[in-house]
Amino acid sequence: MTDSTHPPFHNEPHGDSLGDRLNWLRAAVLGANDGIVSTAGIVVGVAGATDSRATLLTAGLAGLLAGSMSMAAGEYVSVSTQRDSEKAALALERRELREQPLEELEELTELLAARGLSEKVAREAAEQLTRRDALRAHASVELGIDPDALTNPWHAAGASFLAFTVGALLPLLAMVLSPLSLRLLVTVVSVLAALALTGWWSARLGAASVGPALLRNMGGGALAMGVTYAAGALLKAAGV
């Protein structure tokens, strides 16, 4: 009987933890991708208008800092909202367990039965889990939350800031460190190579086809650089 009560309660947090790790990794890849594309668009666009290394560096750094701070702030707000929702759900569950324990036991039994357990086994499992840790049982089975592993907005913000910054540094350094005659070529090639890598990672993490992911990622980056370079060149030709 003990074995039959383990899967619903103990296996789910492991699955959630794996899902959380994959979500963090996917977010890091996408953050780096955003840094690559947005900063590449900025420095290539400016390069279309001027050859000044100082101007390119200033524009690139401004874009890097603005983008990384925006990503971090957005992630902080988003994850803080999620954490508040998780806390509120746990508080409600705690109150319901205190005020109506029998109804909550019935609810847990029904949830376990819905996962394929017989009514008798589900009842026994629910009783054992309730005696062990009622809040944790309901949080895991009913809410899909680990009370000891709530999302951390500061970690999320820091990860987004770092991912975007790492991605943004590639086109910025390629542009300002390369010789003038090779500046655009080195930047475009390095950006497309990096986008191929992040596209491959995104496809692998999402169990999707690699080819279309590479085409979308590299095509989007190439389009961004082409449009911004054309805009910069037009401004230069207009004497702006």
Which residue ranges define each predicted feature?
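Hydrophobic alpha-helical transmembrane segments
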Residues: 28, 56-61, 154-161, 184-189, ...
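Cytosol/matrix-facing amphipathic helices and coiled-coil assembly/linker segments
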Residues: 2-27, 79-161
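Small-residue-rich segments of transmembrane alpha-helices in multi-pass membrane proteins
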Residues: 167, 216-229
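C-terminal ends of transmembrane helices
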Residues: 76-80, 146-147, 199-209
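Internal alpha-helical transmembrane segments
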Residues: 2-78
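Juxtamembrane boundary at the C-terminal end of a transmembrane helix
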Residues: 229-240
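Transmembrane alpha-helical segments of integral membrane proteins
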Residues: 170, 189, 193-208
